[in-house]
Each structure stands twice: as C-alpha cells, then as structure tokens.
Amino acid sequence: MTFEKLGEPALDYFPCRYGTSKLLFRGPRRRLEGDFVTFLGGIETYGRFLPTPFPALVEHETGMRSVNLGCVNAGVDAYLNDRSLLDICGRSRATVIQLTGAHNMSNRFYAVHPRRNDRFLRASRYLTRLYDDVDFTEFNFTRHMLTSLAARSAEKFDQVRQELKSAWVARMRALIENIDGKVVLLWLADHKPCEDGEDCVADKDPLFVDRGMIQALTDATASVIEVAASPAEIAAGRDDMVYGAMDLPAAEEMLGPVVHRRVADQLARTLDRLM
C-alpha cells in the first residue's frame, strides 16, 4: 500500500478533455485516429486509485488503442447530452459502456447537474406534491435525497423507484442508439444483478438496476458482460492500489486491480470476437 503526504493525491491522472466536451477524463490524452475502442462509465472505468484500470489493460491484451471516457460523477445523461463524445464513440471500432445507477439522471421527479450527474438540482412539482412535507433545498446529492425519501415512506418511494427504473431503460436505449457501431454493456459490481421480483441491494451501485432492465437492452447491443467481484478478489487487490492516507475510506469502496484484470480478460475476448 502506497501513502503520500496527508491529503495529497497519490496518482497523477493526467486529466484531459476530448473534442468540445466540458467533462474531464483520465489521461494521458489518446489519439482519435485509426482503430480504437471507447469506454464510457463511472469511477471504476476511470480507475481511481489504480495505476492501470481495465481500459488500459484491454489495450495491452488486444493491441487496440483504448480511449478512456470514464468519468467519476457521470451517469447516462452526461454522455447522452454530449454530442462530441457520441461522435468519438461513433468513430471507434466498439464502445464499452459500464452500467451506472438509475439515480444519477434527470427524470420526471427531479433534475441533476448536466455533467456532475450525482448533483441534485431541483425537485419537480410531481415530487414536491408526493412529498409535500419535505424541504428539498436541504439536498445537494441524489443519493442523500433518495435515502431520505425512502426512510420517510416506502410506499411513496416505490413510485420514485419505478420512475427511475423506467427512465433508465429509455435513456440507456437512447444512448446506445446514438452510438454508431458495436456497443458492449458491462455490469461491474460486487454483486450480481437482482432478478425480476427480487429486492435490489438498496445501497449498492449501480443503484436500482436489475437484470430485467439490462435484458431490455440486449437487442440493441453486441454483447453484455457481467462481472460480480467476490470479497476475496477485492481484498487481494487492496495492496496494489495507490492512494493517500486521507483517501482510505474512498479506496475501500473500489473493486481493485484483481477485479479489473478479470474484467479486462473478459472484455479482450469479447472485443476480439466482435472485431
């Protein structure tokens, strides 16, 4: 385990931008010429605390240049609303999309920041009528707000959850359909997707996403890869992560390099077959 001065980052992620996008990605910046594969997703795709996250490992295994467009706070909206990034995906040989939660996107009940999708902006009149006793100005983040609403009323919250699930499927399908070329979906978590009729793990990412929602997208994708990391795999990779002392709680939430190597192996085989 590598520690640096208290509060200082232990890795230089060489932040960079692509095209006209305002989002910051992990660098160094890659050339967008010739054959390459694009990767969309959240903090695991970005590879926080990892010297070599799975997009880079895929490049090593396949010889195909990887363009890592993973973003720490991005949900579906950040990509769907960014024409520049969609154009980059359309120029690639394939696009891998790590599935992100259904909570970090705008919907009938609330709006999120267009780039930092974890940021709650405002409640709609539907939500304020449903929860007429809640002061929504108290919330800055979607997860905090949803946790509070769920604690107040399970019956009311079921309406919110169903809206998020429905909106996620529609938004994901729109994202896939706006990408020219092959799309591979990646489930990456410390648990399997819950089956229809089961209660999804309430506080685990990707939040509210179940197997039925993923299956609703399979007709529009080239492949779906499922990686459910075991506690042993996560623990085995902990010593190879790089972070400062202040980042320990956040680092403990990450899946780690052993899991990323398994993801890369599966993706490399799939991409070789598709291309």
Which stretches of residues belong to each language-model region?
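Short, hydrophobic/glycine-enriched beta-strand segments
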Residues: 1, 37-41, 98
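A broad, low-specificity signal for short, low-complexity segments enriched in glycine/proline
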Residues: 1-4, 55-60, 142-149
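Helix-enriched interaction subdomains in cytosolic or periplasmic regions
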Residues: 1-13
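Alpha-helical structural elements
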Residues: 8-9, 20, 126, 238
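Membrane-targeting and insertion segments and their boundary/processing signals
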Residues: 10-11, 25-28, 32, 36, ...
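Serine-esterase "nucleophile elbow" of acetyl-processing enzymes
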Residues: 14-73, 78-88
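Alpha-helical cap/lid subdomain in secreted, periplasmic
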Residues: 87-275
